[in-house]
Amino acid sequence: MKAKGYIGLITKGTPARGLAGATLGFFIGFAAVSLFGPTAKSLRGILGLSPLEVGLLVAAPSLSGSLLRIPFSAWVDTTGGRKPFLVLLFLSIAGMAGLFLTLHFYYPERMPRSFFPLILFLGVLCGCGIATFSVGISQVAYWYPKARHGTALGTYAGIGNLAPGIFTLLLPFALVSMGLAGSYLAWLAFLIAGTGLYAVVGRNAWYFQMVAQGVPVEEAKPASAARGQEIFPAGNLIESLLLSARIWKTWALVAVYFTTFGGFIALTAWLPVYWISFYAVTPVVAGTLAGAYSILTSLVRVGGGYLSDRLGGELTGILALCFMLVGALMMTLSGNFRLSVVAGIFLAIGMGVTNAAVFKLVAQEVPEAVGGAAGWVGGLGAFGGFAIPPILGTIVEIRGAGGYASGFVVFVGLAAISLLLVGVLRQKRARVFAAI
């Protein structure tokens, strides 16, 4: 499409194509959440890892995946999402290539314990793809009018969040048929093909395309607005981050999202270890159970958004966190396989619905700095995916095999604290309405 007044200026893409590209890129990158969970048993035996080190192993991808969210989201405001997406995916490819080559040439006979730091580093590199979440959120938001953000962003997050569950389901089968190195080679091929496809399909919104071709900002905005683009870079992300950081409600929501979304990432990585080590199931069964948890959590997030619109974010969050608390208590006290499966369902429902409720609350509780608050919540909240698994591993080290169950007391505590915080938010809001 040619822009008026600029000979040779061509803009490409549509909102639907922008959504498809961003969703594809996020799906490809976010799968790294499940990088080591299904394979931890094999690596633990070869490297001689303690439970704490297993926790660090499965959490490694989430370190970069959470900490890179804020800076790469800010980068979108200057260049559009395409370049940040490709950089993160190429870093993930580099990590996966290194992991495959290490396993291909050294696993299992020539892979002593001294390889553990290298494996962790490669896991952190692979996890860069997890940070594509914030990039895609911004890229999709620029393509769509505000009235369609709910549907567009819900589609983006819902489909992309399915990736870890699907890979957790598939990886154990790949291990049986292709071995450890072969499984990661297949994943590497998927990453390369998917990144290439994103490079073809992914498009920045019209405004960024025009600016990149030399159109002045003051002319690119009205030209893009004429085609339906409503959102433009405000240029005040730093100010928004600083302002939202001074509002206590921002940190309350960070804590809740740390519990539910960070907890979701942590459990997607940890549950295969839990099922194999505590109930002695096969890797295929463990992968199926962990994958089902991850997929269910992602799917109910969509319904959680609907409930939040109908019941309000606070009430939805309180009800969902009660589900999570019950599930965590059941996991902590249960030594029964079937009861633990039911508990996992409670956890999935509670976490998934609360994840949706939190972002309903961001705009409601911090209206003066929504962008900054969303950055803190999304970035630091996801850090739970890195912080929680080592804590679970430490509890196993201290308590032995029984620690796999009693470690869920961490989620009991987090759910209780989050319930208290959402309750305070609800009470404060009720007082405001009463004073009007």
Language-model features, listed with the residues they occupy:
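C-terminal transmembrane helical hairpin of 12-TM major facilitator-type secondary transporters
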Residues: S308-V358
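Juxtamembrane intracellular "pre-TM" segments in multi-pass secondary transporters
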Residues: M1-G13, Q209-A252
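C-terminal membrane-cytosol helix-exit motif in multi-pass small-molecule transporters
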Residues: A189-A223, L419-R426
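A membrane-interface helix-boundary motif in multi-pass transporters
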Residues: V176-A189, T394-L414
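C-terminal ends and interior cores of transmembrane alpha-helices
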Residues: F90-M111, C322-G335
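Cytoplasmic helix-loop-helix junction between adjacent transmembrane helices
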Residues: L122-I159
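Extracytoplasmic gate region of multi-pass secondary transporters
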Residues: F36-K41, I247-V300
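Helix-loop-helix hairpin linking two adjacent transmembrane segments in secondary transporters
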Residues: Y156-Y207
